[in-house]
């Protein structure tokens, strides 16, 4: 269930970001896309200690600490997976954004222009014209995401701790 939910969140977020990179001009677009590509290159082990501390002492703008006196411990729950996936920081999200962006750059802009002429907004054009064409890449990225989440032991041990999961049990059998 966790793998399915995380995969759906990853694909939803990465599709919006990939479409934005493919179709819109905004300041520092090349810089932000380079930052996305760098996330593919950097191994997750390099940021594991900061992720562990961030989700062990979770606090947004000091709100929880100001109201309750302590921060939230999100370890031991699937919430860190959901937060990372929804904000495009999850496992292999840079790769999915790159793949989806490349697919969207191959779709002719005349399809979008025709939808704009017919009175569609940007979001309606994305939803009714672009997304139906993008089903092949979305299915491919979903399958990649699901399999990587299902077989991931690193993030499972980091975020979930001692919870029994099939991927964690399989890794102990291999040892």
Question: Residue locations for each model-derived region?
Answer:
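A structural signal for multi-pass alpha-helical bundles of membrane permease subunits
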Residues: 1-175
